[in-house]
């Protein structure tokens, strides 16, 4: 089901070369509070890499439908626009992606010890990780957000 578009004019989407079908913008990396806040854009009709969340998180879907798939490829869940879902670290590995249109979803990762995501192969073996260190480097490499000051 198509939803109203989320205004992304002020977002300079970033990508990672080995993770297709997803773009991101990092809003916060706070080592002291152990928070990593990210806006993701998932391609319509595509799935990202198999992964596992290593920190508790909440998601808020801002555009489209976020589709969650089990490691077998079976559709597990559809989160429509406006869905707010909390998840726990070390849940079931999964892939995710968009339905009929690109999905934009805000992820707030909380209580991050070091790892945020484990990237998995088809046998559920860890092939890469993304943690506080990597997200700090990606955040620092982003262009600054436009100023919100009026004067």
Annotate each PLM feature.
Residues 1-34, 120-151:
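A short, N-terminal "cap"/entry segment at the start of jelly-roll beta-barrel domains
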Residues 44, 53-72:
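Glycine- and acidic-residue-biased ligand/ion/polar-headgroup-sensing regions
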Residues 34-52, 88-91:
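Conserved short histidine dyad/triad with adjacent acidic residue
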Residues 85-86, 100-117:
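A short hydrophobic beta-strand segment most commonly corresponding to one strand
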């Amino acid at each position: 089901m198509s939803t109203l578009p989320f205004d992304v004019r002020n977002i300079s989407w970033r990508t990672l070369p080995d993770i297709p079908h997803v773009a991101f913008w990092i809003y916060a990396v706070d080592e002291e509070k152990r928070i990593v806040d990210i806006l993701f854009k998932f391609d319509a009709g595509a799935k990202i890499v198999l992964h596992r969340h290593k920190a508790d998180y909440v998601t808020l879907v801002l555009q489209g439908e976020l589709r969650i798939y089990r490691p077998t490829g079976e559709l597990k869940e559809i989160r429509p626009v406006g869905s707010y879902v909390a998840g726990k670290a070390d849940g079931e590995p999964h892939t995710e992606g968009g339905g009929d249109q690109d999905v934009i979803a805000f992820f707030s990762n909380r209580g991050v010890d070091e790892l945020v995501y484990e990237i998995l192969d088809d046998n559920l073996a860890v092939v890469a990780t993304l943690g506080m260190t990597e997200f700090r480097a990606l955040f620092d490499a982003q262009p600054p957000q436009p100023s919100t000051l009026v004067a």
